[in-house]
Amino acid sequence: MTVYVTGDIHGGLDMQKLRDWDLGDSLTSDDYLIVAGDFGFPWDFSAEECADIAWLESRPYTALFVDGNHERFDHWAERPMELWHGGLTQRLSDTSPIRRLTRGEVFE
């Protein structure tokens, strides 16, 4: 297992840095990418945004994020909490591997 950390992708605004990340294609389902603030998905559910989300969900690694100030908190307020690796998380959708890591939780 390997953990990589980035920040501030602001939804589709800065997704290109992940698309250009050569190492990302060589990772496995045991690896994690943590976005430390301003993940920014979902925002408006546009066709372009949905394509970006689908691309991120198709990656071999698991995308996780800690929220920043550029999040759709109204969306996340509607998502159920789930226990995951010892801490509370929320998934982007019921079937999405993308998880919001709840502030103040400790993950194993």
Which role fits each region the language model picked out?
Residues 1-4:
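Extreme N-terminal starter segment of soluble prokaryotic enzymes
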